[in-house]
Swiss-Prot record:
InterPro entries: UppP. Its main location: membrane. GO terms for cellular component: plasma membrane. Its EC number is 3.6.1.27. Keywords: Antibiotic resistance, Cell inner membrane, Cell membrane, Cell shape, Cell wall biogenesis/degradation, Hydrolase, Membrane, Peptidoglycan synthesis, Transmembrane, Transmembrane helix. The keyword Zinc does not apply. This is Undecaprenyl-diphosphatase. It is an enzyme of class 3 (hydrolase). NCBIfam families: PRK00281.2-4, undec_PP_bacA. It catalyses: di-trans,octa-cis-undecaprenyl diphosphate + H2O = di-trans,octa-cis-undecaprenyl phosphate + phosphate + H(+). It comes from Campylobacter concisus (strain 13826).
Amino acid sequence: MEISHVIVLALVQGISEFLPISSSAHLILVPKLLGWPDQGLAFDVAVHVGTLSAILFYFKDTIFKLLRDFFASIAQRKMVGDSLLVWCVGFATIPVGIFGLLFNNVIEEYARSGVVIAVTTIIFGIALYFADLRSTNKSEYEMTIKFALIIGLAQAVALIPGVSRSGITMTAALFLGFSHKGSANFSFLLSIPVIILAGGLESIKLIKDPNALPWSDIALGVIISAVSAYICVKLFMGIISRIRMLPFVIYRLILGAFLLYLFL
C-alpha cells in the first residue's frame, strides 16, 4: 500500500469507528470511490486494533474499576459494585461471536458491495432516528442481562457492512430507554471484546499466511487510527447529549442515497 493510502484509511477508521456511521463501510467505500485496490480485511482489523487501544486508554479508569468489581464478585460469588455491567458486556458479546464464526465467510463474499452498504446505511439510519426519540435518562449502570442480550443480538447484524456496530448498539440501547451517554458508553465498552475477537480471528489467518500483511503499513495505520479515534471519542462524548443523533441520521441518508446513485 502507498503511504498516502495508509494515512487516509487509518484516519477514516479512527474517525468513523465509534460514530454511528459504519467504519467498515467507509473502509470498503473509500478505496472503491478513489480507485484504490482493496486494502483487505487484514488491514481493516489492524486499524481496529488502533481504535481498540484508543478506547482502552479513554476508559482506563472505568475499566480498572469494573474489572476489580468483576473479580471481587467471582471471589465472593455475588454481585459487587458494578460487576453486573461486566457480565452484561460478556453476554452481549456472545451473539456476534456465534454469528461471526458461522457467517463471516458468506458476508465477506456477498455483502461487501456498494448496493448492500447503501441499503443498510439508509435502513439503519432511519432506525437510529426513531430510536433517538425514545431515549430517557437511564445510564449504562442500569443495564440488565436481558437488555444486554437484546443489544448483543442487534450487534450481530452489524457484521453486514453499512449497518455500523456502534450505530446499531446505540440504536438498540436508545430504543430500550437508555440515555445518549449511557448508550454510547455501553456501545464503546462492548467494542472491546468484539475488536479483540475480530483481531484474534484474523491473526490466525495471518499466521498461516504472514506475507498477507505489510507490517510497516500496519504499524503506521495503528498509530494514526489510535490517535484519531481517541480525539473523536472525546469530542463525541462531549457533545452527544446536546446534538443527539439527528446529524448522523442525516449523514447516513445522504450517504446512502449517493451510494445508490453511484452503484445502481
